[in-house]
């Protein structure tokens, strides 16, 4: 599995700000979008371009355009919605596919409850967004669903990943690509990433 920990100074700085314990909902939400935007920049670096002639201000001009890439952004509800706009900043024409999965707090197992996928998803590159890759269960279940529907080009974008989640994802889906702003130390006994960000969903939506 291709694993990219994006170590750009802007990414490191913004993620560091997100680790503040008393960060406001507004600030956390803004930073989640900004870091997702920077991860998207990295995740799309292998997109091919082609020469296209357009009408410029002084006659025809040849420019580079991305070659035939249909993209769907796949936020995992609910926290993934906090990263979606960061992707759409760069790919505004992307279709949105929504997958609802929550983690049982006792078993830590993923429980699917909703999905609405883009049409012709088998022809698209899926960019799955979720702030945290902890146990990996929700991400694996989401990718299982995408592959069942014929989507086999999948990139995963997360703010923070735990080694345990990376290992589980790689075992289940070695063909996907993972882009993360940080690989943290470990999971605690409650399945939270340490040092992590806390509950990203609560911080994005202002709930507890």
UniProtKB/Swiss-Prot annotation:
The keyword Glycosyltransferase applies. Uracil binds at residues 193, 198-200. Its cofactor is Mg(2+). It comes from the Bacteria. Its EC number is 2.4.2.9. GO terms for biological process: UMP salvage; uracil salvage. CDD domains: PRTases_typeI. Gene3D superfamilies: 3.40.50.2020. Belongs to the UPRTase family. This is Uracil phosphoribosyltransferase. It comes from Vibrio cholerae serotype O1 (strain ATCC 39541 / Classical Ogawa 395 / O395).
């Amino acid at each position: 599995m291709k694993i990219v920990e994006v170590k750009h100074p802007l990414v490191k700085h913004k993620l560091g700000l997100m680790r503040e314990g008393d960060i406001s909902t507004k600030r956390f939400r803004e930073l989640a979008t900004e870091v997702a935007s920077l991860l998207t920049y990295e995740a799309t670096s292998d997109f091919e371009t082609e020469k296209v002639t357009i009408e410029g201000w002084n006659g025809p001009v040849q420019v580079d355009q991305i070659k035939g890439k249909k993209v769907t952004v796949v936020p995992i509800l609910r926290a993934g919605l906090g990263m979606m706009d960061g992707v759409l900043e760069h790919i505004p024409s992307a279709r949105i596919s929504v997958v609802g999965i929550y983690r049982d707090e006792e078993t830590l197992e993923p429980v699917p409850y909703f999905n609405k996928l883009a049409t012709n998803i088998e022809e698209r590159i899926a960019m799955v967004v979720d702030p945290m890759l902890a146990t990996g269960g929700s991400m694996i279940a989401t990718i299982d669903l995408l592959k069942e529907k014929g989507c086999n080009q999948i990139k995963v974008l997360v703010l923070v990943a735990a080694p345990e989640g990376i290992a589980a994802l790689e075992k289940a889906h070695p063909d996907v690509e993972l882009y993360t702003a940080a690989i943290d130390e470990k999971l605690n006994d409650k399945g939270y990433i340490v040092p992590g960000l806390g509950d990203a969903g609560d911080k994005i939506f202002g709930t507890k």
